[in-house]
């Protein structure tokens, strides 16, 4: 399977996740590029002093996009149930177990009648069952390939969601910096001017302007805090997306291992075991014929006996112990069982992510309601 390049490469948001303190959302201006600083200046100009309605709308579009993004993430987690993948893998394991290597073991002593009359029937029965199981395994392989394709598409979709979340994060960061920049400008320039004007004036409206400016700065500070909360949600969403991606990636790799390694190996080993069984029956039949000829040709009994022993010895050199085949099938079954464990872990992780995303969505809605509430009262 071709690995998704963007999934493997480091994303710029990873630096914020691993190195930065989550509560510290103030970004140093010297780290901004020239283009970013221009964007900050443009955004900062959108904040007009004493325009409370404009302040309430500042960054609200981004927060609405975050709400829509949370819905999309929740829908993604709820709609992607990997239960059918687990059922398919369980079915595959059942089919592989249905043909036991012990059934191909003919080391136990048998009578001449069993060798000649039942050996051929036993081989045909096992061969017929192997063909049936092999056909079923092929159908399961097609299903696994479809599951693998779906998982790969999901990984690519999650990459898109991750990049979109990163863009929200960056846009919110620029809005926060712009608001902080405007706040400093008002505190250090505009407010002192109004205070000085009020001190030199006897007009009560000048004093009211100072109070209005102070209240506006306070609302601006609260607006910055709300944007920081939204930015925090974007920050926490990133590792959750990666967590789901990692589970899907591991499951897709296990499916690929089953398709390209385990299943072909199982078919090859079964074919080899069946060939060895036929060889053993042929050797046993040859030994029986040699013994019968030895009884009839008494004159050459010793010579025939020696030839039979030598022939049997040479033929027996081709016998292979089936312990290796048993270990191989055990490893195949263990691989599939491990895949089922990963699938179960993935289901648990997605359930946990779903609960967390629902809580995050509820928190965001609560903040948006709290923002709109004071405006309506005023």
UniProtKB/Swiss-Prot annotation:
In terms of superkingdom, the source organism counts as Bacteria
What disulfide bonds does the UniProt entry report for this chain? none
What InterPro entries does the record point to? Answer: Toxic_anion-R_TelA
Signal peptide stretch = none
Family per similarity comment: Belongs to the TelA family.
Q: What is this protein identified as?
A: TelA-like protein SAV1406
Source species = Staphylococcus aureus (strain Mu50 / ATCC 700699)
């Amino acid at each position: 399977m071709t690995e998704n390049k963007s999934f493997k490469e480091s994303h710029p948001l990873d630096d914020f996740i691993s190195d930065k303190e989550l509560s510290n959302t103030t970004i140093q201006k010297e780290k901004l590029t020239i283009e970013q600083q221009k964007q900050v200046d443009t955004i900062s100009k959108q904040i007009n002093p004493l325009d409370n309605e404009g302040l309430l709308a500042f960054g609200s579009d981004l927060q609405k996009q975050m709400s829509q993004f949370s819905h999309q993430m929740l829908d993604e987690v709820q709609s992607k149930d990997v239960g059918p993948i687990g059922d398919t893998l369980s079915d595959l394991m059942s089919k592989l177990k249905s043909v036991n290597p012990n059934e191909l073991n003919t080391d136990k002593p048998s009578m001449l009648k069993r060798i000649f009359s039942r050996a051929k029937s036993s081989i045909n029965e096992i061969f017929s069952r192997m063909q049936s199981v092999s056909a079923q395994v092929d159908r399961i392989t097609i299903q696994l390939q479809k599951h693998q394709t779906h998982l790969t598409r999901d990984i690519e979709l999650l990459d898109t969601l991750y990049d979109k979340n990163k863009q929200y994060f960056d846009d919110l960061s620029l809005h926060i910096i712009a608001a902080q920049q405007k706040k400093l400008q008002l505190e250090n320039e505009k407010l002192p001017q109004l205070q000085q004007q009020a001190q030199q004036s006897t007009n009560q409206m000048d004093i009211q302007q100072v109070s209005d400016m102070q209240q506006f700065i306070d609302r601006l500070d609260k607006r910055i805090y709300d944007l920081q909360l939204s930015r925090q949600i974007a920050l926490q969403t990133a590792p959750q997306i990666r967590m789901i991606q990692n589970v899907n990636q591991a499951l897709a790799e296990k499916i690929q291992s089953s398709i390209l390694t385990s299943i072909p190996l199982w078919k090859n080993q079964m074919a080899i075991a069946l060939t060895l069984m036929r060889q053993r029956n042929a050797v046993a039949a040859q030994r029986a014929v040699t013994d019968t000829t030895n009884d009839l040709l008494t004159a050459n009994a010793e010579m025939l006996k020696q030839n039979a022993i030598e022939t049997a010895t040479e033929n027996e050199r081709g016998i292979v112990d089936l312990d290796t085949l048993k270990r191989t099938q055990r490893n195949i079954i263990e691989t599939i069982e491990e895949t089922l464990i990963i699938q179960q872990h993935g289901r648990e992780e997605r359930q946990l992510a779903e609960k967390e995303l629902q809580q995050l969505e509820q928190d965001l809605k609560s903040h948006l309601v709290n923002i709109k509430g004071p405006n309506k009262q005023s």
